Amino acid sequence: MIALPVIPIVLIAREYRLSNWMIVGFTLLYALYPATSGGAMYDMHENCFLTFFLLMTIWAAEKKKTYIMILMMLFAFFVKEDAAIYVLVLGTFYLLSRKDKKRGLILMVCAAVYFLIAISVVNSYGLGIMDNRFSNLYFDADGGLSQVFKSIIANPGYVIAQMITNSSADSVEKIAYFILMFGPMATVIFTTGKKYTRYILLSPLIIINIFTTYVYMHDITSSIILELLH
């Protein structure tokens, strides 16, 4: 499943009529990306399925194949409940960039509805969602996701400080994480010109992996990192 995302990468590249050399370059960039193999070295995790389905969702949206897009989106949802966050961000990008408002709205609405249902089911019949990973953004010990959102709005300075705060005083894992995640791409992600809506696609990485001080969320060898490869 880790190698399978090469298929949608090639399909997306062909949709944009990239040269064969550029297609080879993009597939190698994915294959040699530290998080691609690093996230699979710890154990078998459901996240290894997520990248393929998310990229297939993107390909279907680019091709304006609505039914295939919805099918791939549902497969991504079946992998794990927080996959809805990535789909929501993708839909937001399509909507705000005016790239495809119709499919952007479909992705956003489906992601929001699924996420609310999934949270309700997990809280009612399971052990609850793992929102304690963001306890560094709680107002008090009994906080939840609502307090995380309140912290982002009410105290953005503190939240920014948490982005560079490690799990312990003598640790530098976030610095290493930044280097390993952004280093291989050099400055490519900052060459979007005036298409600022593209930076929306970075928000899952910032919110899920950098806001928290939970060490495995920014550990390059953790399977959690596989979520970001879309």
Regions of interest found by a model, annotated:
Residues 127-168:
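Luminal/periplasmic active-site loops of membrane-embedded glycosylation enzymes
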Residues 85, 199-230:
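Hydrophobic/aromatic-rich transmembrane helices and adjacent perimembrane loops
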Residues 162, 174-199, 203-206:
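Hydrophobic, aromatic-rich transmembrane alpha-helices
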Residues 86-113:
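Perimembrane helix-loop-helix junctions
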Residues 17, 46-49, 55-68, 95-98:
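Membrane-interface transmembrane helices that cradle and orient dolichyl/undecaprenyl
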Residues 3-32, 51-52, 68:
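Transmembrane-helix signature of polytopic, membrane-embedded enzymes
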Residues 39-47:
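Short acidic/glycine- and proline-prone juxtamembrane loop motifs at membrane-interface regions
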Residues 67-96:
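Transmembrane helices and adjacent periplasmic/lumenal helix-loop junctions
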